[in-house]
């Protein structure tokens, strides 16, 4: 049975687009943690769910963990992870690396971290109404800057994809897993 692989990285880096292209190349199904979350939440969007929870991401972060638990026995999938998959909230509501989620993710899949320069990501996300709102306290820029070292440290392979075409990113990923 083929091994799973997971794509992690900040919002807007291209994880979903790259995972869909990888699926076309390999025939492996894509499993999106965000899409499973929407299903588990009864079909409401992530922004609506966060709004219903008065801006509190804790319940959503717990749901992400439960999704990873359900995927533990999956084989031969491409896991398209939401941008916050590596994180939980501490008792004060501050985002912190989640050892429970990180350990589980690494037991499920070979992890590929994807990154682009922060300015490119900020520009892409700023006015995208399909993206969940980020905390009023933290700007997207500071969230990305705080998360990047964790994406890098958790990744089995870390790719700076800057201006690479989707096909080139897929080629690099497939080369690493010797597909």
From Swiss-Prot:
Name of the gene this protein is made from: aroK
Keyword annotations: Amino-acid biosynthesis, Aromatic amino acid biosynthesis, ATP-binding, Cytoplasm, Kinase, Magnesium, Metal-binding, Nucleotide-binding, Transferase
> Which residues are listed for substrate binding in this entry?
34, 61, 83, 147
Q: Tell me which residues bind Mg(2+).
A: 16
What are the EC numbers? Answer: 2.7.1.71
Is Magnesium given among the entry's keywords? yes
Q: How is the cofactor bound, as the UniProt entry phrases it?
A: Binds 1 Mg(2+) ion per subunit.
Query: CDD domains, alphabetically?
Result: SK (cd00464)
Q: Which InterPro entries match?
A: P-loop_NTPase, Shikimate/glucono_kinase, Shikimate_kinase/TSH1
Pfam families for the chain: SKI (PF01202)
GO MF term (any one): ATP binding
Per its record, how is this protein called by name? Shikimate kinase
The keyword Hydrolase is annotated on this UniProt entry = no
């Amino acid at each position: 049975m083929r091994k799973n692989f997971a794509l992690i990285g900040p919002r807007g880096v291209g994880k979903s687009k790259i995972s869909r292209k990888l699926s076309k190349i390999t025939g492996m199904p894509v499993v999106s943690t965000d899409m499973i979350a929407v299903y588990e939440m009864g079909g409401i969007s992530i922004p609506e769910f966060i709004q219903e929870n008065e801006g509190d991401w804790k319940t959503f972060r717990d749901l992400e963990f439960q999704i990873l638990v359900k995927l533990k026995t999956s084989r031969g999938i491409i896991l398209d992870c939401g941008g916050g998959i590596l994180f939980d909230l501490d008792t004060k509501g501050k985002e912190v690396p989640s050892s429970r989620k990180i350990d589980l993710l690494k037991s499920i899949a070979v992890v590929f971290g994807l990154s682009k320069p922060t300015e490119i990501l900020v520009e892409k996300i700023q006015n995208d109404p399909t993206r969940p709102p980020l905390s009023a306290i933290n700007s997207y820029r500071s969230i990305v800057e705080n998360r990047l070292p964790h994406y890098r440290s958790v990744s089995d392979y870390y790719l700076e994809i800057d201006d690479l075409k989707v096909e080139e990113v897929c080629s690099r990923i497939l080369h690493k897993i010797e597909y």
